[in-house]
From Swiss-Prot:
Keywords of the record: Acetylation, Activator, Cell junction, Cell projection, Cytoplasm, DNA-binding, Glycoprotein, Isopeptide bond, Methylation, mRNA processing, mRNA splicing, Nucleus, Phosphoprotein, Repeat, Repressor, Ribonucleoprotein, RNA-binding, Spliceosome, Transcription, Transcription regulation, Ubl conjugation
Organism whose genome encodes this protein: Macaca fascicularis (Crab-eating macaque)
Modified residues (Phosphothreonine): T39
Low complexity biased stretches: 252-266
UniProt modified residues of type Phosphotyrosine: Y380
In-chain residues carrying the UniProt-annotated modification N6-acetyllysine: K34, K198, K405
Designated name of the protein: Heterogeneous nuclear ribonucleoprotein K
Omega-N-methylarginine: modified positions: R316, R377
Chain intervals for the UniProt region annotation (2 X 6 AA approximate repeats): 245-329
Disulphide-bridged cysteine pairs: none
Gene3D superfamilies: K Homology domain, type 1 (3.30.1370.10)
Entry-linked InterPro entries: KH_dom, KH_dom_type_1, KH_dom_type_1_sf, ROK_N
Phosphoserine modifications at: S36, S75, S116, S214, S216, S284, S379, S420
Length: 464
């Protein structure tokens, strides 16, 4: 639905020589990266936007979007949504799409830019946010920007190439940063390709990617992302939500961490809510092959994040971790980290080292939770060493001490550890929640240590 938005117009690129022309050496570089596109072929581009940026594209009374449709003879739409994200859809030939993007990019702004937390700093709050990056402040195209391209998951391999060769070539030839997120958008088969750099180069990169994927047929089921099913528990590279208490409305900003916290999107009048993540997992096309047998964990890939999460297999015939209702460990550890029956949760974990935390939370043999598969290659080469996955369980009453207000605490743990951390909702009738940690061995160990400290520091203080 196109609603009336504050007046905002596109820059006149015809009178702005800086934006319309590129140095000869740039053109030579592009020629070195040859493309064999049919310039008349119609393709569809879908860009993930912050909801607040829809007004810049639509314009007051739909003025801007109507001008784009008329001037470029293209199909341009920004469907409404109830969350912090919307999708800009453009259907035209590739060259025309590039020109439309050059019109749109200077009108956008990036969301709240939070200071990066450090190991010793407090968690940043919205009041600490610096000024939004508004691309309209710049003249010409000499500024850095980011766009999030949506592609079907089956097309990712064509962008990455053999051992990452294609994506490396793209980065070098277009002088952009490219990150292909591994996890699909919530309840969809779409993945996010985050492209950053100067506007002209970002647009050129997108044109090349469109050319690459236009030659490849989509394989498998196609379920385009619907932003109304926005869910921060998915680490897909979209935008997260922060509520502006002064206005009582959600404010979107880029996900700079590695995921989100457990929170389902608010319902929308008359619109059915998506099934729970666990239910949806059963029909996900990304389930991959069955997990390898114990002791033969895969290497080189990340476990299919949308796999149905099994109950933790008991190491050596016992429970992975036993708790009482106050969140204290019980007395069954089967040779792992031992505690006396009267030892409290706080006194126990006070003395844990990272290695002891890891021992207590990982099954003996080291691979019982390492359900890896080779299909997940997003973030190719971003991390050193094999990517593994570990699952731990905590009483659901303690989850708040890890998540924190607005999810800020878990975001900081992700940021500091570099690991992907997901906290599942408890199963029906269960008093526990499963935490899935994905990353290198060092990242997982750091994450476990930070989780330990968070529970120790906040469980009693906040009354969990």
């Amino acid at each position: 639905m196109e609603t009336e938005q504050p007046e905002e117009t596109f820059p006149n690129t015809e009178t702005n020589g800086e934006f319309g022309k590129r140095p000869a050496e740039d053109m030579e570089e592009e020629q070195a990266f040859k493309r064999s596109r049919n310039t008349d072929e119609m393709v569809e581009l879908r860009i993930l936007l912050q909801s607040k940026n829809a007004g810049a594209v639509i314009g007051k009374g739909g003025k801007n979007i109507k001008a784009l449709r008329t001037d470029y003879n293209a199909s341009v739409s920004v469907p409404d949504s109830s969350g912090p994200e919307r999708i800009l859809s453009i259907s035209a030939d590739i060259e025309t799409i590039g020109e439309i993007l050059k019109k749109i990019i200077p009108t956008l702004e990036e969301g709240l830019q939070l200071p990066s937390p450090t190991a010793t700093s407090q968690l940043p709050l919205e009041s600490d946010a610096v000024e939004c990056l508004n691309y309209q402040h710049y003249k010409g195209s000499d500024f850095d920007c980011e766009l999030r391209l949506l592609i079907h998951q089956s097309l990712a391999g064509g962008i990455i190439g053999v051992k990452g060769a294609k994506i490396k070539e793209l980065r070098e030839n277009t002088q952009t940063t490219i990150k292909l997120f591994q996890e699909c958008c919530p309840h969809s088969t779409d993945r996010v390709v985050l492209i950053g750099g100067k506007p002209d180069r970002v647009v050129e990169c997108i044109k090349i990617i469109l050319d690459l994927i236009s030659e490849s047929p989509i394989k498998g089921r196609a379920q385009p992302y619907d932003p109304n099913f926005y869910d921060e528990t998915y680490d897909y590279g979209g935008f997260t939500m922060m509520f502006d208490d002064r206005r009582g409305r959600p404010v979107g900003f880029p996900m700079r961490g590695r995921g989100g916290f457990d929170r389902m999107p608010p319902g929308r009048g008359g619109r059915p809510m998506p099934p729970s993540r666990r239910d949806y997992d059963d029909m996900s096309p990304r389930r991959g092959p069955p997990p390898p047998p114990p002791g033969r964990g895969g290497r080189g890939g990340s476990r299919a994040r949308n796999l149905p999460l099994p109950p933790p297999p008991p190491p050596r015939g016992g429970d992975l971790m036993a708790y009482d209702r106050r969140g204290r460990p019980g007395d069954r550890y089967d040779g792992m980290v031992g505690f006396s029956a009267d030892e409290t949760w706080d006194s126990a974990i006070d003395t844990w080292s990272p290695s002891e935390w890891q021992m207590a939370y990982e099954p003996q043999g080291g691979s019982g939770y390492d359900y890896s598969y080779a299909g997940g290659r997003g973030s190719y080469g971003d991390l050193g060493g094999p990517i593994i996955t570990t699952q731990v369980t905590i009483p659901k009453d303690l989850a708040g001490s890890i998540i924190g207000k607005g999810g800020q605490r878990i975001k900081q743990i992700r940021h500091e550890s570099g690991a992907s951390i997901k906290i599942d909702e408890p199963l029906e009738g269960s008093e526990d929640r499963i935490i899935t940690i994905t990353g290198t061995q060092d990242q997982i160990q750091n994450a476990q240590y930070l989780l330990q400290n968070s529970v120790k520091q906040y469980a009693d203080v906040e009354g969990f």
